[in-house]
């Protein structure tokens, strides 16, 4: 670093980050000291952001996939002019602060997504880059490029070791996400020690084999070399990885070792760091020249870029008024839907086929709906419209995710984070295990991502226990802010899908059946929106309540009718969404599940655990499934009417 002001800025980021971590007595100084020059170069020479209009639509997106480097992100965002004060920096990792331990979306200005679980940032960045590429192709006309921005990622060795990163890198290369630029903080150290103890890949050959552009910067403090590499990446027609060799904990006594990764430096080491860097400022003191430099090279440059874009958008409005109006509709999700186009299924059908048909109709009417399946389109019946999104065909809204469930979940999140599009992904329910961290991320970030899973019980049948979900409802229903919906027929499918598509701040999971299900007399699309409602009422004094969902609801109703023949009268409640039901007024919940009726039996072909919240008794499945034709499943597991009738009669 030859430029004195650049050197001062980089060292300011380093010391702000170190002092934040010291004050909190918690954090990760290694990446702050090693990567400060990388993030400084990106912000001051390339990143187009408007700190005065943080949601400017055509801004570049920057994802700190290595979320443990949050102190560095907060420090530079403070310098850049975001609403992050010195007091906020001093409150790093403290109760109710605006600077939490890992970056949190919508909690701190300048944070594009919640990161921390390694690999999630890279994969979601693929979704952002895909969204940019699709929308640019859809809207840009006559050199009026109203969608024209880059997605940048800063990652470390740990990110690239995650399986989700491998999936995402492969996907990005295949779909040629050329405006995705990954800055790889390659310091050869991770928490356990040297990276070569766990990893011996040839990064260059690996990325080039997956259709990425690769560059190496040998000195992570060489701002000019980093700048040149980013310039080259922006010209590339492929996604780009820039491997930047850094020294973890640069400037301090433990630099270059794993000792510096995740613990505060302390007073003595910080003093040595200041001496080594020639940095004489007091803790949390920032030279006015640094603020001035960032104001000129980040804030002012970003405002100018925004102004140019706004002028371009006005010209676009004048020349292409219809397309402009469509653009506004995309950005605001302002599309109307004609529900009369949704077919009825009076004779029943599998809910996977019904949902697939309904999703097709939504896609026909909502041009911003995009998504696909993890190599399971013929089985899930879930696909996007207008053909396949490919490197050489950007009009398609069907994303062929391949057998990459984890990346699919994060890519869906990234598309939804980007804005302008509403994304969904689908697979077999049993393989929601592979997606759980991405689904959890969606719930934390309050993203309206849509995850659709077919084959939701042991009625998968012949494929056996590896393909038959048991604990999966319990797993997903236990995630806060996740709406897990399990419809029983076309009327409930209609409600569940509409709720998911119109959700604003809650991700949705919809599970569907492999087998055909009957259409039930008293199911109701409106009532289903409450999460639970009465579908069969006892003709006389209620002895108890059966609660069920999905494919077992019809069996529960038939069981109630069988009990009635023996003068035992029960109510049947459909509960497609415990999440929605829990959010209703107490008066409504009492009307469906009166507290005076304690004899309640929940019936679902999955783990029994979640249902004890609503029922004293549960008929579930707490063993793994079996390989057999579906005709054997109900009797074997006790979900036929005769077995359920006897089960209820034996309740005390």
How does the language model describe each region?
Residues 1-150, 297-508, 516, 641, ...:
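Thiamine diphosphate
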Residues 58, 240-333:
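Terminal amphipathic helices with adjacent charged low-complexity linkers/tails
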Residues 152, 370, 545-547:
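Conserved beta-strand elements of the Class I
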Residues 153-154, 182, 372, 486, ...:
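Residue-level marker for buried hydrophobic side chains located in beta-strands
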Residues 158-164:
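Short acidic, Gly/Ser-rich segments with clustered Asp/Glu that frequently serve as metal-coordination loops
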């Amino acid at each position: 670093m030859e430029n004195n002001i650049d050197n001062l800025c980089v060292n300011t980021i380093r010391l702000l980050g170190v002092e934040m971590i010291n004050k909190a007595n918690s954090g990760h100084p290694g990446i702050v000291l090693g990567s400060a020059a990388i993030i400084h170069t990106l912000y001051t020479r390339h990143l187009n952001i408007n700190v005065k209009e943080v949601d400017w639509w055509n801004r570049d997106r920057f994802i700190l996939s290595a979320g443990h480097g949050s102190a560095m992100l907060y420090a530079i965002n403070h310098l850049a002019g975001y609403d992050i004060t010195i007091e906020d920096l001093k409150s790093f990792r403290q109760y109710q602060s605006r600077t939490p331990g890992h970056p949190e979306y919508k909690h701190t200005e300048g944070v594009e997504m919640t990161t921390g679980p390694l690999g999630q940032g890279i994969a979601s960045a693929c979704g952002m880059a895909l969204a940019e590429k699709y929308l640019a192709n859809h809207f840009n006309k006559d050199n009026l490029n109203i969608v024209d921005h880059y997605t940048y990622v800063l990652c470390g060795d740990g990110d690239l070791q995650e399986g989700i990163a491998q999936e995402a890198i492969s996907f990005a290369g295949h779909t040629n996400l050329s405006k995705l630029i990954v800055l790889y903080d390659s310091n050869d150290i991770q928490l356990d020690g040297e990276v070569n103890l766990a990893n011996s890949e040839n990064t260059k050959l690996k990325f080039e084999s997956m259709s990425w552009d690769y560059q190496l910067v040998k000195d992570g403090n060489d701002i000019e070399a980093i700048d040149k590499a980013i310039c080259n990446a922006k010209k590339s027609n492929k996604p780009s990885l820039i491997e930047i060799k850094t020294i973890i904990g640069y400037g301090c006594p433990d630099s270059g070792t794993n000792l510096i990764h995740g613990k505060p430096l302390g007073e003595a080491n910080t003093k040595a760091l200041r001496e080594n860097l020639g940095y004489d400022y007091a803790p949390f003191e920032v030279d006015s020249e640094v603020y001035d430099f960032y104001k000129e090279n980040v804030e002012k440059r970003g405002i100018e870029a925004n102004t140019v874009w706004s002028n371009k958008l006005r010209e676009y409005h004048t020349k292409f008024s219809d397309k402009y109006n469509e653009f506004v509709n995309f950005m605001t999700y302002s599309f109307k839907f004609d529900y009369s186009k949704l077919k009825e299924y009076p004779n029943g059908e599998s809910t996977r086929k019904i949902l697939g048909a309904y999703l097709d109709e939504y896609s026909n009417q909502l041009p911003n709906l995009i998504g696909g399946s993890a190599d399971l389109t013929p089985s899930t019946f879930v696909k996007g419209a207008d053909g396949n999104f490919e490197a050489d065909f950007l009009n398609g809204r069907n994303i062929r995710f391949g057998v990459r469930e984890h990346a699919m979940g994060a890519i869906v999140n990234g598309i939804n984070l980007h804005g302008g599009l509403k994304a969904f992904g689908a697979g077999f329910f049993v393989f929601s295990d592979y997606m759980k961290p991405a689904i959890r991320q969606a719930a934390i970030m309050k993203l309206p991502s849509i995850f659709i899973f077919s084959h939701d019980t042991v009625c998968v049948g012949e494929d056996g226990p590896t393909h038959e979900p048991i604990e999966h409802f319990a797993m997903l229903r236990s995630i806060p802010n996740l709406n897990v919906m399990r419809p029983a027929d076309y009327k409930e499918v209609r409600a569940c899908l509409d709720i998911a598509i119109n959700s604003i701040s809650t991700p949705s999971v919809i599970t569907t059946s492999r087998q055909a299900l009957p259409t039930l007399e008293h199911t109701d699309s409106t009532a289903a929106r409450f999460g639970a409602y009465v579908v069969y009422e006892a003709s006389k004094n209620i002895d108890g309540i059966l609660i069920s969902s999905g494919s077992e609801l019809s069996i529960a109703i038939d069981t109630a009718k069988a009990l009635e023949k023996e003068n035992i009268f029960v109510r049947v409640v459909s509960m497609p969404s415990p999440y929605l039901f829990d959010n209703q007024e107490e008066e409504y919940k009492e009307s469906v599940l009166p507290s005076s009726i304690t004899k309640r039996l929940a019936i679902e072909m999955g783990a029994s655990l979640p249902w004890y919240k609503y029922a004293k008794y549960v008929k579930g499945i707490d063993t793994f499934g079996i390989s057999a034709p579906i005709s054997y499943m109900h009797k074997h597991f006790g979900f036929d009417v005769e077995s359920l009738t006897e089960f209820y009669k034996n309740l005390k």
